[in-house]
Amino acid sequence: MCLTNTGEHISIYAYLYGAGDAKIGKIIGGNAGQGKAIKRKFNKAIPAIANLRHAVEDALVYPIDYKSTRGKKTRITWKRHYLYGLDRRKLHVRSPHSALNLLLQSAGALICKKWIVRTEERLLARGLKHGWDGDFALMAWVHDEQQIACRTEDIAKIVCAEAQQAMRDTQEFFDFRVQLDTEGIIGHNWFECH
């Protein structure tokens, strides 16, 4: 997803992962003022993300009166240095601006871990055997991608369907309100599947 501003594009990830005005300005080939304007436009276009960022920061630090601190280095006062992840574990926060990134990275990792486990469970429940002497073998798990070798194309189709259902199981497990999906691609090597 991109936000357009006079022909320039900014990746949503830079914003979500805590890029400041200067960094966003640099990404678009501009300056901090232009970066700030892009962020303002983005927040106006998708207020839910701005609200989420503010809610996360409000849970961590006390508000700063920016008018009284203009031009001075401000010191934040922490309420707490942690947030809770999807699995209720404490996530220790380094800085308020990186807190949303921490939540997103944690959620992504937990979702993918659960998805991998549920895929395996579902395939075994279908009577398939895991291993090089069996029907399928997990060759790689990279970020949000599984690479699974299958004995036949029919088994590969089953793996794709079960991986999709495993993702929906994961959505339900974490009570995730956004639909989670995956895409299965069948090929003879990683290049064909990626």
Regions found by a protein language model. Give the residues of each.
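Conserved catalytic core of nucleotide polymerization and phosphodiester-bond processing enzymes
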Residues: 1-194
